[in-house]
Amino acid sequence: NKAGWRFILTIRENYKEQVKSLLEEQDLTDFEYIDIPLLNDKELEDILEKNQRKIPVQPHLYKDLHNLFYLAKYLECTTSTNISLTQFRDQIWNIKVRGMGIEDLANQEKREQCFLRMVQTQLEKGNYIIPKENLDYNSVSELIKEGIVAVDGFYGYYIAHDLYTDLALVKLIDRIWHKTQNVKDFFEGLPDDIRHQNAFCKWFSVLLETDSLNLADEFIEQMFEGLSYERYTNAIVASVLSSSNCGKHFFEEYSCELKNNNYKWLSKVLRILMISCQRLHSYVTY
C-alpha cells in the first residue's frame, strides 16, 4: 500500500474469487496470486519412498496426502499403510489435539473440549482472535506447544492452521450424527455456513465409502423431501456423484425422482455437477 506495507493472505482455491471481489470493492487491485499446488503423484510417492513408507491402500487417504500438512502428519503419527482416512484423522486428533500418550484420560478430555470450544467460539463470533476468557490455561498451553494454537499478544489466541479447524468440525458433525441417528434431526442440527458444509462433505464422502447403500439412501431421500439449507443439498449431490460406491446407484435408483416436474431435479444435479467440474478444472494445475 501507500505506506509501504505488503500483505500476504493465505486462502483456499474455492475462496479465491470471493477474496478478489472484496479487494476490488476497496479499490485494492494491485495484487498477485502465488499458487502453491498440491503434490503430484510422483512427488508424493518419492517422498514416501525416501521416508521408507509405502503408498497407503485407501484411496481417500492417498488423495489427502497430496496436501503437505496431511503428509507431514502421516509420517509423524502413523506406521501402517493399511489405515483408513477416518483412522488417520482420528490418530492426528488423538495425538496432537488430545495429547494421547503424554496426558492422562482426564487431561485428554480437557484439551479436546478446550479446542472444540475455541473452534465454536471463532465460528459463532466470526472473529479471527479468540478471547482468553473461559478457556483452560493448561490445555491452551499444551495446544500452543503442539503448534495448533498461537498467541496474539494480550488479546487472545488464534488457531494456527485451519485444517485443525476442519478436523474439529468433522468431529463435531460426527457427534451430531451419533447423537441423533436420524437424518432429518441431523440436518436440523447443522449450522448454515460454508465451513460446516465443507466439513460435512468430508464426513459424508467417507460415510458413502464405508457404510451400506441403505444409509446413503436415507440421506438422498431426505434431500428429495427437502432440507432446511440448500448448501447441504449441493453437498449431498456432489459427494454422491463423486462416490465410486454410490454414483451409479443414485441414477438407477432415483431415475423417477430426477425426471419428475419436467426434470427439475436432474437439472439441479447437472448444474451442481457442472460447478464441481469447473472447480476441479481450476484446482488440478499439474
Model regions: which residues?
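Structural recognition of the conserved hydrophobic beta-strand(s) that form the central parallel beta-sheet
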Residues: 4-13
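Extended amphipathic alpha-helical scaffold segments
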Residues: 124-127, 174-286
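Conserved small helical "lid"/interfacial subdomain of P-loop NTPases
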Residues: 14-58, 70, 74, 93-97
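Short, conserved phosphate/pyrophosphate- and ester-handling motifs at nucleotide-, phospho-/glycolipid
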Residues: 67-71, 161
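Short active-site loop/helix that positions an aromatic residue
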Residues: 163-177
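Winged-helix-like regulatory helical subdomains adjacent to P-loop NTPase cores
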Residues: 77-141, 152-158, 162, 175
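Conserved nucleotide-sensing/catalytic segment adjacent to the nucleotide-binding pocket
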Residues: 1
